[in-house]
C-alpha cells in the first residue's frame, strides 16, 4: 500500500514539475541571436504553425487554445551580459493573448500587477496591485511619452530594469510606466511581430549605443493584432492582404511582419478586459468574423466596408 501511495505521489510530483517548467521561459538579451532564439522558443511552445502561411522553414503561428493555467513567466536575462545582478526581473504574461499582467522582483518575489489584472496570482509570489491599468493609453499618460518615436536600446533597458527593481508600493509611477512600455515592446510585441523583433534586435550587437525607434507603422501593427489574427487564417494565396492601413503583398511580406497571432475562434481570446481604446488589439467580439476575398485581395471586413462606402458616396 505504501509503495502504491509513493508511486501516486511521485507521479503527481512529476506532472506538477513539468507544468511549472512549461510555464517558465527565458528571454536572453545577451546578443541579437540569443534574443531571437529565445523568442522563437516561446512562440513554438505556445503556438501552432499555419501551413498556408509558410516559406523557407518560417511559418506564421497561431496561439494554441491550450488548457490549464493561462499564465507563463518570462525571465529577463543578459541585459548586461557581464553583470549577473541584472537577472532578477520576471514578467508574468497571459498565454492566450500575450498581455503582460505585471512584473516580479525575484529578490523578494513581489508580483506588481496592473489594476486590470488584480485577480491574477502567480505561485510563490506576494501580489501588490498597482494604481494604474496596463492599457497603452494609461502607460503613455503616466510615462509622459508616446510609443511612436519611443527609443529602446541596451542602456535604456538597463535603466528600466533598475527602476523596476527599486520600486515599492502600489503607485504606478512615471519610471515604472516607462520601464513597462519598453519591456512590453521588446517581449510581448516582439513575440507577436517580427517587424518589431527585427527593428530592436540589431541594437543588441551595436556597440555605438544605437536605439530602436518605434515607428508609426510598428504602432499600427500592434493596434491591429486582433484584426490581423481574424483575417490571416483565411489567406490562401490571394494577391494581397488589407487590414486598415496595413497591406501585405506576399507570404514573405506577412512573415516579415507578423510572427504569432491570436486564436480568434477560441472564446478566451475574445474576452476584452482592456480599456476601450485597446479593443483593436483584441479579436473581434464576434468570433465568426472572417476575412473577405474581393478582387483577389483578402480584406478585413471593416476595411472593405469603409472603402466600398466611400466609393458609393463619391460615385
Curated annotation (Swiss-Prot):
Sections of the chain in a coiled coil: none
Disulphide bond pairs: 264-283
Top-level taxon of origin: Viruses
Region described as A1: spans on this chain: 23-273
InterPro entries on file: Ribosome-inact_prot_sf, Ribosome_inactivat_prot, Ribosome_inactivat_prot_CS, Ribosome_inactivat_prot_sub1, Ribosome_inactivat_prot_sub2, Shiga-like_toxin_subunit_A
Signal peptide residues on this chain, from the entry's feature table: 1-22
GO molecular function, one term: rRNA N-glycosylase activity
Annotated positions for site Cleavage: 273-274
Pfam families linked: RIP
GO biological process: negative regulation of translation; symbiont-mediated modulation of host virulence
Annotated keywords: Disulfide bond, Hydrolase, Modulation of host virulence by virus, Protein synthesis inhibitor, Secreted, Signal, Toxin, Viral exotoxin, Virulence
Main location: secreted
Localization of this protein: Secreted
Documented EC number(s): 3.2.2.22
One Gene Ontology cellular component annotation held by this UniProt entry: extracellular region
Location of the active site: 189
Annotated region described as A2, given as residue ranges: 274-315
Family: Belongs to the ribosome-inactivating protein family.
Family annotation (PANTHER family): PTHR33453, RIBOSOME-INACTIVATING PROTEIN (PTHR33453:SF34)
NCBIfam families membership: Shig_StxA_1a (NF041694), Shiga_Stx1A (NF033658)
Role this protein plays: The A subunit is responsible for inhibiting protein synthesis through the catalytic inactivation of 60S ribosomal subunits. After endocytosis, the A subunit is cleaved by furin in two fragments, A1 and A2: A1 is the catalytically active fragment, and A2 is essential for holotoxin assembly with the B subunits.
Subunit: Shiga-like toxin contains a single subunit A and five copies of subunit B.
Protein name, UniProt field: Shiga-like toxin 1 subunit A
Organism expressing this protein natively: Enterobacteria phage H19B (Bacteriophage H19B)
The gene coding this protein: stxA
Amino acid at each position: 500500500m505504501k509503495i502504491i501511495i509513493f508511486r501516486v505521489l511521485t507521479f503527481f510530483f512529476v506532472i506538477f514539475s513539468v507544468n511549472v517548467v512549461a510555464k517558465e521561459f527565458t528571454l536572453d538579451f545577451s546578443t541579437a541571436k540569443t534574443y531571437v532564439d529565445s523568442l522563437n522558443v516561446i512562440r513554438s511552445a505556445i503556438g501552432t504553425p499555419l501551413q498556408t502561411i509558410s516559406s523557407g522553414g518560417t511559418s506564421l503561428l497561431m496561439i494554441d487554445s491550450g488548457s490549464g493555467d493561462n499564465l507563463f513567466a518570462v525571465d529577463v536575462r543578459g541585459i548586461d551580459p557581464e553583470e549577473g545582478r541584472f537577472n532578477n526581473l520576471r514578467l508574468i504574461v497571459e498565454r492566450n493573448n500575450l498581455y503582460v499582467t505585471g512584473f516580479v522582483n525575484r529578490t523578494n518575489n513581489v508580483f506588481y500587477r496592473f489594476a486590470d489584472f488584480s485577480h491574477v496570482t502567480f505561485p510563490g509570489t506576494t501580489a501588490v496591485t498597482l494604481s494604474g491599468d496596463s492599457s497603452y493609453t494609461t502607460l503613455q499618460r503616466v510615462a509622459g511619452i508616446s510609443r511612436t518615436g519611443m527609443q529602446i536600446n541596451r542602456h535604456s533597458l538597463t535603466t528600466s530594469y533598475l527602476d523596476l527593481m527599486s520600486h515599492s508600493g502600489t503607485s504606478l509611477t512615471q519610471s515604472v510606466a516607462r520601464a513597462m512600455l519598453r519591456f512590453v515592446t521588446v517581449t510581448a510585441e516582439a513575440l507577436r511581430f517580427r517587424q518589431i523583433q527585427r527593428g530592436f534586435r540589431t541594437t543588441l550587437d551595436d556597440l555605438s549605443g544605437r536605439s530602436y525607434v518605434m515607428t508609426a507603422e510598428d504602432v499600427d501593427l500592434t493596434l491591429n493584432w486582433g484584426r490581423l489574427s481574424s483575417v490571416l487564417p483565411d489567406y490562401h494565396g490571394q494577391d494581397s492582404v488589407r487590414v486598415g492601413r496595413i497591406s501585405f503583398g506576399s507570404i514573405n511580406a506577412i512573415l516579415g511582419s507578423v510572427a504569432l497571432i491570436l486564436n480568434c475562434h477560441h472564446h478566451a481570446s475574445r474576452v476584452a478586459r482592456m480599456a476601450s481604446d485597446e479593443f483593436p488589439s483584441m479579436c473581434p467580439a464576434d468570433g465568426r468574423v472572417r476575412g473577405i476575398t474581393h478582387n483577389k485581395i483578402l480584406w478585413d471586413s471593416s476595411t472593405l466596408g469603409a472603402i466600398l462606402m466611400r466609393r458609393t458616396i463619391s460615385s
